[in-house]
Amino acid sequence: SAGIESPDYVWNADSAEKTAILKLKGDASSGREAYQGCQGCHKSNGAGIPDGTYPQLAGQHASVLIKQISDIRAGLRENPKMFPFAGKHVVTPQEIADLAVYLQNMKIPRDNGKGPGTHLARGKELYLKDCQICHGDNGEGNADKFYPVVAGQHYPYMLREIRDIRKGKRRNA
């Protein structure tokens, strides 16, 4: 497959690792244990940090989490903060599957994602025009297509990721 800098790059192309991890049966109990190493940044409830430095992971589709970690490991998503934690020498494919199931089953803290609320009508208009087709009517995403849940995600995180996608900095989305 073409590298991320290539115009032929496909954001959701299958990778051998992603495909292999998706075939594994994740165990939420083992995922809970493995998540201990993630809590420093993403917090015990998976809510991340309100300033958007660390995203909410609670309630995210397991397939999306697996894709993102696989992309980081393959160098298809730049995320220097995650490199030390997502490396192949740190976390196994089975642990990724376990973590993904555990996080998917966590309750989404919906109040997380609220921005200032100053332009709600315009935000809704933009969402319906540009985002709804993939992320759904209520930000629920689509696990089968690797479209993430955006409902409840931190407002500053969303702004940063949207800007990075538009600038071509984040090309795996």
Regions found by a protein language model. Give the residues of each.
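The canonical Cys-X-X-Cys-His
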Residues: 31, 36-44, 99, 123, ...
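Disulfide-stabilized extracellular ectodomain repeats and their linkers
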Residues: 38, 54, 62, 128-131, ...
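Electrostatic cytochrome c docking/interface patches
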Residues: 3-35, 50-53, 104-126
